């Protein structure tokens, strides 16, 4: 699972 905080917080 890849989580990002920029530009929006989301996990794929």
Swiss-Prot record:
It is found in: Secreted. It comes from the Eukaryota. Expressed by the skin glands. One of its GO terms (biological process) is defense response. Keywords: Amphibian defense peptide, Disulfide bond, Secreted. One of its GO terms (cellular component) is extracellular region. Coiled coil: none annotated. Transmembrane segments: none annotated. Disulfide bonds join 3-11. Stimulates insulin release from beta cells at a concentration of 100 nM and release of glucagon-like peptide 1 (GLP-1) from enteroendocrine cells at a concentration of 1 uM in vitro. Reduces secretion of interferon gamma from peritoneal cells in a mouse model. Has no inhibitory activity against Gram-positive bacterium B.megaterium Bm11 or Gram-negative bacterium E.coli ATCC 25922 at concentrations of up to 100uM. Has no hemolytic activity against mouse erythrocytes. This is Tigerinin-3O.
